[in-house]
From Swiss-Prot:
Its EC number is 3.5.3.6. This is Arginine deiminase. It holds the Pfam family ADI. It is an enzyme of class 3 (hydrolase). One of its GO terms (biological process) is arginine deiminase pathway.
Amino acid sequence: MSSHPIQVFSEIGKLKKVMLHRPGKELENLLPDYLERLLFDDIPFLEDAQKEHDAFAQALRDEGIEVLYLEQLAAESLTSPEIRDQFIEEYLDEANIRDRQTKVAIRELLHGIKDNQELVEKTMAGIQKVELPEIPDEAKDLTDLVESDYPFAIDPMPNLYFTRDPFATIGNAVSLNHMFADTRNRETLYGKYIFKYHPIYGGKVDLVYNREEDTRIEGGDELILSKDVLAVGISQRTDAASIEKLLVNIFKKNVGFKKVLAFEFANNRKFMHLDTVFTMVDYDKFTIHPEIEGDLHVYSVTYENEKLKIVEEKGDLAELLAQNLGVEKVHLIRCGGGNIVAAAREQWNDGSNTLTIAPGVVVVYDRNTVTNKILEEYGLRLIKIRGSELVRGRGGPRCMSMPFEREEV
């Protein structure tokens, strides 16, 4: 076995180890009035979402893949009382609690939870004001009075089951991301503790991006096309400045990649990440949403004389990919088969967001029937999972998974 606990040098190598997060009580803290604040469009039914997620995890195990869980890894990282206390204080500091008495009450509540995983899951779920002792009227400050109708002392983290985004494994390294929205940036705290203190991963993995950066990048915009070539998305959630910082670190730390293809496409919620419109499913096959093709700009980025060299690519995308992957021809498989209605509907339901677990073997939502049929016509083996509730969060199988180990291809 390699001495590196993280080994991810492709999108398609046989998946051996993956991290998920089983949806928890955080989904039951979603309210209609605050969906936009928490980056949701709808409210999943937790019981069914958990059943769907458990079936997803079991489908991976049935393929011989070891499934890890974020909540367990984070709990295992609290290896001493001092680290546990530090975690609670950082969590409180990042929760934007404006009232001192509320902060004291939450600290007491969290310290009263003795089991580490229960503690971690509570921080994920959020804290309602009704869980805390009532503040006497005479002790309330202006913040308490003005925000009296808001039900949460600390917001939930309902997007956590999309484990692809808070950090990304790249080769033997990790990009610990600074995320687009404050409501999600708190999620990266768990990755910080895993890669700093976990018995297996702590202190053993190079960071090529740090959550303390002030520019934004998310894992859905970080794809590994081969051991030499990365793809990154300039999207609603990831800006060009972050990509430049990431790439300089990757090249300087000699992580192993020689070139990056940067994809610039429409900046909107429909296409929030590159992997919602473009994924690799085999050595020479990709899914793509046809709506991005007209406005797509691709830049080749290399590192020469200690600086980035950036060239805009003007040619055909399939030819560009074939050239960079060293294959004769690349097939772009269009979501919805090019039918404008099917493409829009199935992209919204993550028809382009596939998780490849081996060359030509992909996990997909069963609901995207048009796209799935086309994938099968291209000779791919599909592992179809239900996602009626999971999809309400606007993410598919790739969004819900973070590979920790793949075989080389």
